[in-house]
Swiss-Prot record:
It is a peripheral membrane protein. It is found in: Cell membrane. The active site is at residues 113, 169, 256. One of its GO terms (molecular function) is phosphatidylserine decarboxylase activity. One of its GO terms (biological process) is phosphatidylethanolamine biosynthetic process. Catalyzes the formation of phosphatidylethanolamine (PtdEtn) from phosphatidylserine (PtdSer). Is synthesized initially as an inactive proenzyme. Formation of the active enzyme involves a self-maturation process in which the active site pyruvoyl group is generated from an internal serine residue via an autocatalytic post-translational modification. Two non-identical subunits are generated from the proenzyme in this reaction, and the pyruvate is formed at the N-terminus of the alpha chain, which is derived from the carboxyl end of the proenzyme. GO terms for cellular component: plasma membrane. Belongs to the phosphatidylserine decarboxylase family. PSD-B subfamily. Prokaryotic type II sub-subfamily. This is Phosphatidylserine decarboxylase proenzyme. The keyword Lyase applies. The keyword rRNA-binding does not apply. Its main location: membrane.
Length: 298
């Protein structure tokens, strides 16, 4: 059971997890862990399933998925019958009216929909995966010089489960450098898996880039793939100016995670999100929602 905080209702909710029984069996049983290490985490497994989900025959999975998780497709650009495959449905675009971006330029907005954790004044060599398991930023991006810029900064971790909107966006105007790709495995990023696999983010396939934002400094953005995420698609053009809210990219099928690292004294996260993180709960947020502010005097 995964419990998260809904800041709109100020209540705790239970997450509906796609494939929950299989995830728990895989990461909690000797046979499941053996299957995970020999088959599931491999690129071939995710690539094959991704190939299937790109095929027209996979359309038959869409309606049952929508019904099971009570998804609102009235906010999607396409109608249900117009999706060419399950992946086409999975990384669907939303109507412009579906999400509103906080109008204040000093507001730090969410890059997408998902469950958020926020850590301030971070120790780069002891980043929290879950309680008792840590990793370092140097291990994560394999670039010590870049990592050192974020000493005592802020780390945001946005987890996108399979039922979420799977496109991610720029949180400010600015210019983004090219993305660096790091090969890796395909472990699930579900909290169950995070408790079982040490340094999971450092093990999985991932991409990172530096976004030179106009109001929040140089932001390190890291997209982490997961089980059955065959592709992390970067839809932006490097070195070209972008506007606040412009799309940066999207994930194909699977749960995924985006991490943002901010330099010291650049932002202040909203107190409710920080408090829930300290209590061990993720906070559910939507793209464009205010999650913090620019640090005064910066």
């Amino acid at each position: 059971m995964i419990k998260y905080y809904d800041r709109k209702t100020q209540t705790y909710q239970i997450e509906k997890v796609a494939g929950e029984k299989m995830i728990r069996w895989t990461y909690s049983s000797p046979v499941g862990m053996r299957l995970l290490e020999t088959v599931v985490k491999k690129r071939m497994c995710s690539s094959f399933y991704g190939w299937y989900l790109d095929r027209r025959i996979s359309r038959r999975k869409i309606h049952p998925f929508v019904c099971k998780f009570d998804l609102d497709l009235s906010i999607a650009e396409k109608n249900l019958k117009d999706f060419s495959s399950f992946n086409d449905f999975f990384y669907r675009k939303l109507k412009p009216s579906a999400r509103s971006i906080d109008p204040c330029q000093d507001s730090l907005i969410s890059l997408g929909d998902g469950k958020l954790l926020a850590y301030e004044d971070i120790n780069l060599d002891c980043l929290v995966q879950v309680k008792g398991l840590t990793y370092s930023l140097k291990e994560l991006i394999k670039d010590p010089e870049t990592a050192s810029k974020y000493k005592r900064g802020t780390c945001l971790i946005l987890r996108l489960c399979p039922t979420d909107y799977h496109r991610f966006h720029f949180i400010d105007s600015g210019i983004c450098e090219p993305s660096h790709r790091i090969k890796g495995s395909y472990y699930s990023v579900n909290p169950v898996a995070l408790q079982k696999v040490a340094k999971l983010f450092c093990e999985n396939k991932r991409e990172w880039s530096i976004f030179h934002s106009d109001h929040f400094g140089d932001i390190l953005t890291i997209e982490v793939g997961a089980t059955f995420v065959g592709s992390i698609i970067q839809s932006y053009t490097p070195h070209q100016p972008v506007a606040r809210g412009d799309e940066k990219g999207y994930f194909k099928f699977g749960g995924s995670t985006v991490l943002l690292f901010f330099e010291e004294n650049k932002i202040k996260i909203d107190p409710d999100i920080v408090e829930q993180t300290k209590l061990g709960y993720e906070t559910y947020i939507l793209f464009g929602e205010k999650i913090g502010v620019r640090h005064k005097g910066r």
